[in-house]
Amino acid sequence: MDKIATRRLPKIAALGMTTMTLLLGAGPGSAADDLYGTLKKINDSNTVIIGHREASSPFSYVDDHKKPVGYAMDLCAKIVDEIKAVLKKPGLTVTYVAVNPQNRIPMVMNHAVDLECGSTTNTLGRQKQVEFSSVYFTTGTRVLARKSQKAAEIEDFNGKSVGVIAGSTNERAVKAMMTAGSLKDIRIVEIKDYAEGLSAVEGNRVDAFVTDDIVLFGLIAKSSQKADLVVVGRLLTYDPYGIMMRRDDSAFRLVVNAALAAVYRSGEINRIYAKWFDPIGVPLSPIMKAGFELQALPE
């Protein structure tokens, strides 16, 4: 445990008791005195700021009505409900701010967003800057290409161009394979976001686009050229997704994980999952089912 968290321990314990009394209808006066960090920020501003992606289907994207929607957004809505209950503020304002792979971590660290609800992998390196909720999805790196490439694995793109999002776990995986010598003469093309990656493959500007396979399935589902596209190859990485938040804020993390645990415990996660993944033909895997059960912590 870090020094900051150690100093906060008495207040964290107090907040745990305060949370229960708030939910039971006790007066809010003493509760406000115990708040700190993100909960205090939200309480004082009467606003929770949600960071969302613009084209990370089916997790977090902007629909035809310019509304942020998706699997991660539905889970974050449950978290917002929990925050409202804890703070006894049912009229809490929710503000949405678009983020991208390049600015999502700085936006969280700089208090521009309180929760990043997208498709962000929880890594040990990122935990040096931010914190994550319990895992709500697991995926891994694979390859999107045109069927005409007749590729089976990423090694089939030796001597060709491969698009990657700068700073992503997928980029690191490809570059590690290049360093190891299993990928040779590949030309790396930096891609801004998922939408650009799809467009680059559709327009033959790159031979392949490498990112999380579940995102690739979502991109194909929305493509006008879906019959010509395919996801190929083995999983190159293991990528557990989490809701991103600021570090050293155990009280807020507890509220976030309590909300997710309730969704897992009640079985509501099955309905939410089916809503977003059944349409793209991705059933709930045994690994994900076990993950939800393991994280369905009792109150």
Where are these regions (language model features)?
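Acidic, polar ligand-binding/catalytic clefts
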Residues: A77, K88-D156, A296-P298
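Bilobed "Venus flytrap"/periplasmic-binding protein-like clamshell domains
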Residues: I49, A55-P58, P68-A85, T121, ...
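Short beta-strand-to-loop elements that line the ligand-binding cleft
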Residues: L87-N100, K184-D193, G233
